[in-house]
Amino acid sequence: MSLLTEVETYVLSIVPSGPLKAEIAQRLEDVFAGKNTDLEALMEWLKTRPILSPLTKGILGFVFTLTVPSERGLQRRRFVQNALNGNGDPNNMDRAVKLYRKLKREITFHGAKEVALSYSTGALASCMGLIYNRMGTVTTEVAFGLVCATCEQIADSQHRSHRQMVTTTNPLIRHENRMVLASTTAKAMEQMAGSSEQAAEAMEVASQARQMVQAMRTIGTHPSSSAGLKNDLLENLQAYQKRMGVQMQRFK
């Protein structure tokens, strides 16, 4: 796996699924392929994206700045600086300085990532802030190692919390989760159906599913009533795709 592929993988792992994730993936691919060279416009676009947490925006801004060639005097962006200040905690800053000194001795991506993984997310963000604010310099490879270590920690905690939700025995949470999944699957079906003539059927199924979820939420239903909702939807989607000659197993 190439270095940039690895960076893209880690960075995208902390971006919530949805149309915005696909957009960010495209931007990252363009940047890494040298197709997008307007850092100013890229940062302006990133700043105004909804849904993303300030830290995720900060990490993406840091990656764009590392990758896109820019004039030396280009202003640093406040939204990135604020996200990478380790919540203003002096302990984070102290640890970030110690980590920075260690990173100065590293020359490889994997070496830097290993060193960084033993620090807290706050210290890692502060260390990125040091480099972003030009208070310290490391090679691009080492900076990417720092980025990936930070993303790995964030993705780990997201995964833990996701697993807790999936394995919860609380029927109300499970019920709501099934309805949310059915709703997002319906949305994906509508997007995939696009404008082809045969799409009307898939759109109809998706629309009915969304109306059903809306009705269930409005009148309040028994927690077990949503069981199988998402799977029914997926079976419909796959039947539609078979007729279209498309095989897609990705939603399972």
UniProtKB/Swiss-Prot annotation:
Which keywords does the record carry?
A: Host nucleus, Membrane, RNA-binding, Viral matrix protein, Virion
Please give, as recorded in its UniProt entry, the membrane topology of this protein.
Peripheral membrane protein
Q: Name one GO biological process term.
A: viral budding from plasma membrane
The answer on whether this UniProt entry bears the keyword Transmembrane helix reads no
Q: Which stretches does the entry tag as region RNP-binding?
A: 165-252
Q: Where this protein primarily resides, as one coarse class?
A: virion
Region entry Membrane-binding, spans: 1-164
Please give the GO cellular component terms listed in this UniProt entry.
host cell nucleus; membrane; virion membrane
Family, per entry: Belongs to the influenza viruses Matrix protein M1 family.
Further information in the entry reads: Most abundant protein in virion. When expressed alone can form virus-like particles in transfected cells.
Full protein name:
Matrix protein 1
